[in-house]
Amino acid sequence: MDKNKSTFKLKNIGPIYYINLDGQPERKEYMEDLFKYWEIDNYERVSGYDGRDDDLSDILKGRYPEQMTSGEVGCTTSHLKAIKHWYETSDTPYAIIMEDDIDLDIVRCWNFTWSNFIAKMPYDWDVIQLAIICTGGLHVTLHKRFVNDFSTACYIINRHHAEKLIRLHVRGDKYKLDNGVKPRAVADDLIYNSGNTYAVPIFLYKVQLGSSIHPEHVDAIHKASYNALTNWWTQSGICLLYTSDAADE
């Protein structure tokens, strides 16, 4: 493996909590190797809920959410589990939540460091989405999140917003998803829509790993967004860390 000369850009990143299913050890290995390559040690694995063969009704409080697959339920509850675990076991002001298909390769193209990024975050943020799958024009400046900025592959969340999500959607060791999240209680809508959420695509996602929830989306949506962002970063490498509603493609 080649020597990574860009590790300094991610110095002081963390704490990271990455979600991984027990039934996907190959993804755990991928993440552990990724962190080692980038010299990241401030991370912890969170065992996710697997909705592929179980409807997960036993971990829900209240009605089963409408128009959601068991895979989507597993994704949402796994994120709530990770957020709750961080909130209750750490006193850090924020956490970085990752799924086990995150891709850090474009960090090589950054013209800034993680510390630079943290220093320029908006004063009023609750969540900042750091990986984006978009069905429309891509926005590469830090912007208020658009409705078609999809993906919970990676985001940073503060304690205030974590407390709100736990209060609304966690009941002991169970989860409540029937309390009016619009349009559905999928992870994107539940986490992002209930707070002041910004977005900027400074990380990617490993399309080669596919999708455990929506495999049909990989070719239809994920690859086009991935390719567009990869091309932009490799050709420009400049991320404008101020808020903007203008499209930069």
Q: Whereabouts are the PLM-identified features?
A:
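An acidic/histidine-cluster motif and surrounding catalytic segment
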Residues: 1-98, 102-244
